[in-house]
Amino acid sequence: MASPIAGIWLGTLHAGGSSLRLQLRIDTGNGGSLRCTLDSIDQKAFGIPCSDVKVSGDAASLAVPAVRGGWSGSISSDGKILTGTWTQVGPGSMPLTLERQQHAIEAPASAAPMPAIPPVPIDQIKSLLDKELADALAKGLLAPATHAGVTVGIVQHGQKLVFSYGTAKDDSVYEIGSITKTFTSLILAQMVEQNKVRLDEPVRELLPPGTVAKPAGAEITLIDISTQHSGLPRMPDNFHPAHPDNPYADYDAKLLYEYIGKQGVAKPANPPFLYSNLAVGLLGQALANRAGQPYPALLKAEVIGPLGMKDTAITLTPSLQARFIQGYATPQQPAHAWDLDALAGAGGIRSTAADMLLYLQAQLHPDQLPPPTLAAANGKTLPAALAMTHEVRAEVGDGVHIAMNWFHVDATGSYWHNGGTGGFSSYALFNPEKDFGVVVLNNYAPGDNSIADKLGLHIAQRLTGLPAVSLAP
């Protein structure tokens, strides 16, 4: 017998003066479990996975981890209407009623890839992009009315290039969001090389005594977290921001430990890939505990100090703050900066394109770090630590594996990660075999208004002579 919630549902979410059509597709999979995807139609985001679909009597609920949201409410007696509340980190709670539909609204056809051209050398890439982005600059994502700014950094065979479009400057400071996770994994690798921790060490052993009970069986280790196979959820269930526009600011170590104490650190049998901000934030906090210093100080000591990344920080100095570009959620909605406390290791870094090129150059050539880096405190372990973070360790799916918080595309040999906050998006990629790296920093939150992922991948494809994703507005 089909579940009363199975079917196609359509509703409109009203938030911040704008309206978004949301569509749920729910069916029953093998074994009777409910499967669900969310479509944000007006944002052109389709097929976002749901989880924890539950029905009890006329009550129903589901979670959408990818957007840190979920819906709960009730099913009408005739089974045609879902009445309830959409709750999401940032916007908060909003009423959302959905009606049963006979047919789904399908995703529009994506723009065809731009034809392949011979590989473009670094000294010609900007002139090509100026032409390819002309429409976006005139009437699309980078048009003056959007307030958008984007800074691009490219390194190829040791040659570096930084340039900007829109409201950005070459030295603008951005939030890099979840690219921070790769820094946290590099700290882990550094501390392994320094014999301060082990990859297979239980995370419990790095937490204050009594925080969480030792499980009866296998427990979550540091490498489980660094490969996103810990089994921990994307976010803790005691995450209730006092200020939705700066949601992570008041989530401190006390709340984190309280949650972990309740959740436990038992490792599921054969845990699947499950992307978790909570887990990597916990890793950053745990490593800081072992090092005996706060995460920002540990980050500086192990990574950004030795690499000479002077414009990279968790908390900005006055001079960096003066270059911190305004972020946007939408063209009409400036975004508050995000300040991360206990979960800083998952997404708290701010940086510039030039500094990120120092980081990517180190990724490309761990065995060729400059003498000042090797001579710095903690610098001598960086070559081995960087190499450790590149080792492919688990499958993600669809030709993608994961190293230590770097995704690895099997077909191209590229490593990448992206990031997003309330007003910023970012994309970083490097390819050791072809010896190039790309970073794109954008002052728009991820979604329909962001160009970071698309532009970053496009540049990588142009550098290597592959058909390139369209930059059409």
Show which residues each predicted segment covers.
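Central antiparallel beta-sheet cores of small beta-barrel/beta-sandwich binding domains
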Residues: 3-77, 83-96
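A structural signal for short hydrophobic beta-strand segments in well-ordered beta-sheet cores
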Residues: 26, 53, 73, 98, ...
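Catalytic loop of the DD-peptidase/beta-lactamase superfamily, centered on the K-T-G motif
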Residues: 79-81, 85-163, 288-291, 297-301, ...
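Active-site-proximal loop and beta-strand segments within enzyme catalytic domains
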Residues: 142-148, 156, 168-277, 291-293, ...
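Secretory-pathway/luminal and periplasmic proteins that interact with or process carbohydrate-rich
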Residues: 161-163, 211-220, 230-238, 296, ...
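Short, well-structured active-site flanking segments
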Residues: 183, 190-209, 290-318, 370-386
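Well-ordered alpha-helical segments within folded domains of soluble proteins
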Residues: 184-185, 279-284, 357
